Amino acid sequence: MSDIALHEEAVASTLAGRPHARASARRERPVQVVWCDDVRRGDVAQPNAPKLGVADTLAHAQSTAERNRIVTSLLHLTGFSTFAYFALEFTHERVESLYLHEAFTPSTYRGDYVRHNHHDVDPRTLGARVCNMPIVWDLQQLRRDHQPRDDDASDAPAALDGFLQTMQDDGMCSGIMYSMAVPGTRLHAFMSFTAPRRTREWITPATVEQALSIGLSVHKFASPQLIATSRERAVNGLTPFEQELLIGIAEGASDKEIGRRLDTSAHNVDYHLRKLRKRFGVANRIQLTYLTSKLELI
């Protein structure tokens, strides 16, 4: 535990205050909640993925309920009470969507994470994204490491307090979280383990290894469904005009050339491309072409 704790202390200064900064901006639109199921499994092949026994067991399970039972039985052997597998979709560091999987969402989930914008102040998700090791946490440590500054006049401190209180009320007082980027998407998948124990001292390196084994197995099974769902939503969200724009830049056409094809001005082409860059969270047309090709939108 000591080595893990030292790592947590080393990154605490990097994370301090940043959840407050994320929460300070008012939201123009609510975060969308996207549910994934088993229907899309296998749409996206992962030929280089490691062979994990638990992942194969999940793949051969006959139902969502059976998959949930498999993970729950493994969870109890490790000392944790809940496991959640979810993904956040980011655009310029702003959370746009929360992806949940039917088989790996705790039965206690009731929508507060989105309803109360907890995703904006949850220091665990930020920590998991910037750290190359699992985050081992307890509520006391989260509260201590993210105390608001004396000159902080925003509503972020109250939002963080509300999140931590909800965690405590739900018996989620300590745990482990880690994250993996989902290739070809703007998603980051998170594996979250929680327990009612008040401090993180009970979590040993062996416990972390067990959590990694379970979470990576779930990720191997479920990430293709995240990718397929993300692609489907991206395609469905494009108008025919936007698809033609993307085809044009993929072919190397200039704004003027694309405008001639679509019977519109180069200025209008530039305007819509800027909107697409903002939507997909990229800085230029090269990155836009790369991402839309990876997503198989064109």
List where the protein language model places each region.
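Regulatory hinge/linker segments at domain boundaries
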Residues: 224-241
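Signal-transmission/dimerization alpha-helices at domain junctions
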Residues: 210-226
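Recognition helix of helix-turn-helix DNA-binding domains
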Residues: 254-287
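The N-cap/first-turn positions of alpha helices
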Residues: 241-245, 255
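Regulatory loop-to-helix N-cap segments in sensory/regulatory domains
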Residues: 195-208
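Regulatory input/activation interfaces that engage signals or partners
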Residues: 4-10, 34-42, 53-58, 72-183
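Short, basic, alpha-helical segments at the C-terminal edge of helix-turn-helix-like DNA-binding modules
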Residues: 285-296
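Sensory-domain boundary capping and coupling elements
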Residues: 180-195
